[in-house]
Amino acid sequence: MKFKKQFYLLFICLWAGITKTTFAQQPATYDYVVSSNGKGNFTTIQEAINAVPDFRKKQTRILLSKGIYKEKLVVPASKTNIALIGEDGAVISYDDYSNKLNVFGETKGTSGSSSVYLYAPDFYVENITFQNT
């Protein structure tokens, strides 16, 4: 009887280990990596967005490495199905405001002072702070 209990206990432990190994989460894969220190495919987010093929049917996954990226982004309508995923500490920052003057000496206004212009469908963002400084 004692042997039978030990056998069942061993079986359950082995089964749990196999199940955990079989169903373990696979590491995320990315098409592009943006890193301000030059260790990725690009040093700016806009470069990575520009590199995405127009009207791509499959999702393009872009990893944004930890850091502060001071840039104004434009995501054209042709850059479909993009997922922009940040590491902890990924920040997109820009310092426009509505009364700031443009190159013609006119105020930009609210719609002209956006930090991100998003025209593309199916754009997904995860774990990124958008900061207006």
Segment roles from a protein language model:
Residues 36-38, 61, 80-133:
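Right-handed parallel beta-helix/beta-spiral solenoid domain characteristic of secreted/periplasmic
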Residues 32-63:
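Acidic Gly/Asp/Thr-rich repetitive segments characteristic of extracellular carbohydrate-active
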Residues 1-27:
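Bacterial Sec-dependent N-terminal signal peptides
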